């Protein structure tokens, strides 16, 4: 069973970006390099990992990513604040 991660990044302009990956170290490096990162984060580097959750299945990680993306900024900040151990 592979590990799947949903994550929240804080961009240099203080906006938040949510995504998922199977290799968080590699994905964070990609976001910060600008070469393979998301279009959104390319112009907002550097990015910093502020929240990370491990999810057992691909379907589960996609559902969790969708849940987080639907949250308001305030809700995302509360999630980050309430779960410092998820870092």
UniProtKB/Swiss-Prot annotation:
It holds the Pfam family GIY-YIG. Residues 2-78 form the GIY-YIG domain. Belongs to the UPF0213 family. This is UPF0213 protein SYNAS_10430. It comes from Syntrophus aciditrophicus (strain SB).
């Amino acid at each position: 069973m592979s590990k799947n991660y949903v994550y929240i990044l804080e961009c240099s302009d203080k906006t938040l970006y949510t995504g998922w990956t199977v290799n968080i170290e590699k994905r964070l490096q990609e976001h910060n390099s600008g070469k393979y990162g998301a279009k959104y984060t390319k112009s907002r580097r550097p990015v910093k990992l502020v929240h990370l959750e491990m999810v057992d299945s691909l379907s589960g990680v996609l559902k969790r990513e969708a849940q987080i993306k639907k949250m308001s900024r305030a809700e995302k900040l509360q999630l980050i604040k309430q779960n410092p151990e998820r870092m």
